Amino acid sequence: MSSSPGRPAGSTSWRDGAPISHATNLPGDEHGDFGVLSMDESLTEPGDLGGTTIAVSTLLSINTIMVSAWLEEAGVDPDTVEFVEVPFPSMEQAMTDGQVDAAFTIEPLLSQALDGGAHVIGYPIADTYPGRAHAGYFATRAYVDAHPDELAAFTRATVRGNEYVMDDPDYYRELLAEHTDIPAETLAAMRLPALSTPSEQDIMEILADLTYRYGVIPEPFEGDPSELLHFAEG
């Protein structure tokens, strides 16, 4: 079982002959834990980004898909934008050095970049598909069929753990402080991401369409997106 915040694992794995199921998901919600930032004061809204360079952690990924959809909704042709692959930890420096005009980054690096002088242009996932999944944990269909009890336990633990920490953000931050090297001032300011379940079938259909539309897969997705979904009872 694995998580996928980069390439759209559902449609690409299905395309490559490896049927998988989506067990839990990370929604794009009001928290805005993924955002497009810039150091350039002339870039203040999505419509300003035509003809610019935008850093993403992985090319041909969920990141480029979501930013492209967000740009297109704002009237910007994504083909006029150059996506540049930059590791998340290097994005702030890439903006500072002028290597890129903007960056699509994630917490806690988002808050660190804001402290370093960047400003938010927008939150592509939350702005375009609020409350919809953009990452998740996946398992092969064979594993799902062979290990229903384990999958049910994993799903229960994920959901209950998430509900617990979201009800107590101070404890959530204490756990992050214990298990990560995030500076205390960043922990205090950062937006806390949340897992949720179940996932909606419509976002799987949307992502399947967008992976083809923006060139991640060479042909339209032919499978049934609902077959990518599986949520254990309990």
What feature does the model see in each segment?
Residues 212-234:
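Conserved C-terminal helix/tail region of periplasmic/extracytoplasmic solute-binding proteins
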Residues 1-74, 85, 101, 120-123, ...:
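Short, glycine-/small- and polar/acidic-enriched structural segments
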Residues 40-48, 76-78, 142-151:
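Short helix-loop capping/hinge motifs at secondary-structure junctions, enriched
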Residues 28-29, 126-129, 194-202, 222-223:
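Short, solvent-exposed loop/beta-turn-alpha elements that line the ligand-binding surface or hinge
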Residues 73-79, 216:
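Short helix-capping segments at alpha-helix termini
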Residues 8, 84, 89-175:
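Pocket-lining segment of extracytoplasmic ligand-binding domains
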Residues 145-218:
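Secondary-structure end/capping motifs
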